[in-house]
């Protein structure tokens, strides 16, 4: 999702959590994400524990150690299956109104530096950012030639062609509790 890319790029710059939503807002940025390979998934079962308030406690007499009550573990531990995309490669095109942030990001990416290790949400999903280039967007091209995802409002289904839809968060803003989603977008793509 767009929000994942915004968070990933903000982490590269070392921006504090919930501080970058205006930079990547709908009217100040544009992001395009294109898969560069056929996406394959793998299902991996994992045991999970609850992280609700009150379930995680500090261990008495031990600095920095947290524990979950064994009774909570016995009752609440669940096996869940997570689906991961395997060896994925994406092209990300970015336009920012904030020229200073864009230049700083370009400098970080072109030199292979990042403040925080780029990841797609989990430590198992570390990202490697390569082939960083700058280009100028020009009018023209074939508006019918799309091999990626397309916003739902621009989709014209073709009989006999499979099509999938996915609704994802697109925009966020900071609030008293951290952040809230302010807009969603639905994308269509060929499976």
Residue ranges: model-predicted function:
Residues 34-191:
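Internal, well-folded beta-alpha domain core
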């Amino acid at each position: 999702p767009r929000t994942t890319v915004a968070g990933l790029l903000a982490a590269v710059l070392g921006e504090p959590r919930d501080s970058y939503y205006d930079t990547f807002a709908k009217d100040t940025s544009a992001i395009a994400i294109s898969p560069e390979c056929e996406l394959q998934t793998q299902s991996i079962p994992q045991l999970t524990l609850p992280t609700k308030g009150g379930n995680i406690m500090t261990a008495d007499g031990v600095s920095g150690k947290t524990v979950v009550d064994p009774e909570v573990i016995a009752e609440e531990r669940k096996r869940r299956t997570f689906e991961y995309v395997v060896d994925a490669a994406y092209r990300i095109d970015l336009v920012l109104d904030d020229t200073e942030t864009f230049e700083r990001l370009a400098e970080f990416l072109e030199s292979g530096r990042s403040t925080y290790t780029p990841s797609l949400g989990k430590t198992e999903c570390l990202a490697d950012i390569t082939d960083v280039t700058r280009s100028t967007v020009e009018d023209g091209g074939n508006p019918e030639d799309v091999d990626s995802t397309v916003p739902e409002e621009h989709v014209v289904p073709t009989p006999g062609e499979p099509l999938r839809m996915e609704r994802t968060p697109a925009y966020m803003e900071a609030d008293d509790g951290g952040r809230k989603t302010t807009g969603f977008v639905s994308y269509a793509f060929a499976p």
